[in-house]
Regions:
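Short, intrinsically disordered N-terminal pre-domain segments
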Residues: 1-13, 98-101
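Tryptophan-centered short beta-strand motifs
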Residues: 2, 19, 50-59
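Short Trp-Ser/Thr-centered turn/loop motifs at beta-strand boundaries
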Residues: 10-24, 48, 70, 92
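Solvent-exposed, low-complexity segments and loops of surface/extracellular structural proteins
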Residues: 12, 32, 36-44, 89
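Extracellular and organelle-lumenal recognition/adhesion modules and their flexible linkers in secreted
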Residues: 18-26, 32, 99-101
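Noncatalytic modules at the cell exterior or secretory-pathway interfaces
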Residues: 25-33, 74-93
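Short, surface-exposed beta-strand/strand-loop-strand elements in extracellular ectodomains
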Residues: 38-55, 95-98
Length: 101
């Protein structure tokens, strides 16, 4: 049974997303950006087991004309995950990030 979690929805500024229970492994995480003209963003994906300290497991660089996407697969499950937009630029640029297992 597949499980999808929206880690970020229409993020238009730098932001730390909320913590979510990580979907079971194996799974994938995909971030995308859309806007007008040249758009770019950097999305960090963090995990933790202790409920306190985050560990960045992947940094996704998104860059394109009107849209771009990047992602990765994971094979280990952590208790929680989140996505963070650490940089974003471009007219009307918004970032989405989804975890799927």
């Amino acid at each position: 049974m597949r499980r999808s979690v929206a880690l970020l929805r229409a993020a238009a500024t730098t932001v730390d997303g909320s913590a979510f229970a990580m979907p079971p492994a194996p799974g994938t995480i995909q971030a995308s950006i859309s806007g007008t003209g040249a758009v770019s963003a950097t999305v960090a994906v963090d995990v933790r087991n202790d409920g306190a300290q985050w560990i960045t497991i992947e940094t996704l660089a998104l860059s394109g004309t009107t849209s771009a996407s990047s992602g990765f697969a994971y094979g280990a499950r952590w208790a929680e995950c989140r996505a963070r937009v650490t940089a974003i630029s471009g007219a009307g640029a918004i970032v989405n990030c989804v975890a799927d297992a």
